[in-house]
């Protein structure tokens, strides 16, 4: 019994240490978006698209074991960061994307270089007409988009 309790304690401690509260900010040479926070705005049922603005963004949870970024949603639901075609969004659907960090830079499926700040993206509520939206293009990003990287700031593990 002592072994099982000790083993369970180690496993639970490791799981807690793997979860980290973070915020995301923009790294860019462009002064319009440089240092701005990444937040998310409602665009559909259980779906929030990522936008850039302000200096204080929401707190997300990064789970290094699951390689996922999440945030609490309504009731007992959780939203996960996902790339939906080119739109970056928080969704109640589980993401198949793999999120890691190279230093403090967010990597999607191993790349830190394919994030963009774009306007007029065709998002459902047309928020991108006046705000930069975070988009992901593995290739052929529109020339009007700004190349960005997403950097984390955070605390130590959750408890």
Kindly label every feature range from the protein language model.
Residues 71-103:
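Signature of small four-pass
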Residues 41-42, 47-84:
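Short, well-structured hydrophobic secondary-structure segments
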């Amino acid at each position: 019994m002592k072994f099982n309790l000790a083993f369970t304690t180690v496993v639970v401690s490791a799981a807690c240490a793997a979860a980290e509260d973070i915020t995301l900010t923009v790294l860019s040479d462009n002064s319009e978006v440089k240092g701005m926070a990444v937040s998310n705005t409602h665009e559909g049922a259980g779906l929030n698209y990522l936008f850039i603005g302000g200096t204080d963004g929401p707190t997300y949870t990064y789970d290094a074991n699951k390689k996922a970024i999440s945030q609490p949603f309504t009731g007992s639901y959780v939203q996960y960061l996902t790339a939906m075609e080119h739109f970056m969004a928080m969704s109640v659907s589980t993401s198949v994307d793999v999120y890691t960090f190279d230093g403090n830079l967010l990597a999607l499926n191993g790349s830190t270089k394919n994030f963009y700040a774009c306007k007029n993206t065709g998002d459902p509520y047309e928020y991108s007409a006046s705000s930069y939206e975070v988009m992901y293009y593995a290739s052929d990003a529109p020339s009007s988009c700004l190349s960005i990287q997403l950097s984390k700031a955070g605390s130590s593990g959750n408890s």
